[in-house]
Amino acid sequence: MPRRTLDTVWWPFVQHGLVNDEGDVNVIDSAWGDHFAVFNGHKSPSPPSATPLSVVPGAGSLMECQFDGSASWWTQSLGHAHPALTLAAARAAGRYGHVMYPQATHEPALRLAERLVHDGPGKGWASRAFISDNGSTGMEIALKMALRVASKRFGIAPQERKKIGVLGLRGSYHGDTIGAMDACEEGVYTCEWHRAKGYWFEPPSIGIKNGRTFVKIPSAVAHNKNIEEGQPLSWIYDVSARLDTPLASAYRNHVNDSLEKLTSGAGATQLGALVLEPLVLGAGGMIFVDPLFQRVLIDAARARGLPVIFDEVFVGLWRLGMRTPSSLLGAYPDVSVYAKVLTGGLVPLAVTLASEDVFRAFEGTSKAEALLHGHSYSAYPVGCQVANAALDLYERLVRGEAWKAAKAAWGTDGVGGKEEGDRADTDTTGVWSVWSPQFIDVLSKLDVIEQAMTLGTVLAFKLKGGEMEIGAVFFPLCPFLAPARES
């Protein structure tokens, strides 16, 4: 298999000129829980392994267990081959196969849309769910939605609409399709057709060093680059309490001055939306953005009539210990996008949520006015059924004792959010991590660590060296479900 793969396959995100040896090809036989069963290429005793795999390789085995360190590119939240997800996929495949979705409905898609809009991250602001296939596509849809709203709201002439730009943050990444790339700066992920459309602020970032939390402020905002060094993590994420601080004023002045220069005079930029990855820039380097700065950006965008898009493909659905960052930021978007852990990592699926105002911007008497975006497998039953099963497991997980205990270690009581009762224990205004505060404190004091940071299931750290290197670890959620899995 390795030789045949090297001769035939074109991998994503791989420089093939650097892969010349068959030993560099990872042959995965199967996967279970958080591990792969991998062909080791030789008959020799495999090292001891404490994994959930039912068959542990012994002497002379060709297989060995390998930890899925990337969580299969950030999608695995419940472990490989989770029985509930596998059965959900089989059930939908046997009942539906694939059926068309335009002007039709089926139970898995309807249930998914209703729970995300009415009882999920869209509660309180969203009215519609547009189901697609992956995060990049979901962001393309979000951009089309928001820019249509802006075009109508500002009366932008049709010939000028192709010039509309977006506001965002440097280091953002929204996918590999052309429109999603154009919503970002020029970078390693862009291509020959890329045309950056917009303006991107340098984001203030949060880190922990020697047990102390600091906010690294860009020089364009303030000369003192660590204005709030030493503040507790709970204070940094208490956005409402920080809105009247000197730093908030500095952020507002910087944002408003920049926008005034950008949108006035000759060569002014027509802006159409604010596009944010809330709290953490994932592919851009696991940058934990100061939430106060993002809130100031949101407020400034709202004041100028710009629709707000939250790209929650990476951060949404409890990755950061909360259902959605909206509860922490104290602000809702007009459009938001969910993918990756939406299906527990089993199959691809994305959902773009939109407010009623956004939906109404596409109403009319001709088809040309509709949102003409879709693909053959839009809202395919297998994906929707698996997503519902994954969400069922998440709802159970966040009410479990292990989840509450992890929160309690960080001083969060586990009952938060604005609506207690049906949403109790799902949203929280407190910040916490599955890694203990003591572990983070020790990690941040190591000589080899430049800084560390954690939130929810994400732990990121920078290593000292010639160039800054970043490591990221994603804690699997399946251990929180272990008792339920046995029942």
Feature names for model-found ranges:
Residues 1-487:
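Conserved N-terminal phosphate-binding loop of PLP-dependent enzymes in the Aspartate aminotransferase
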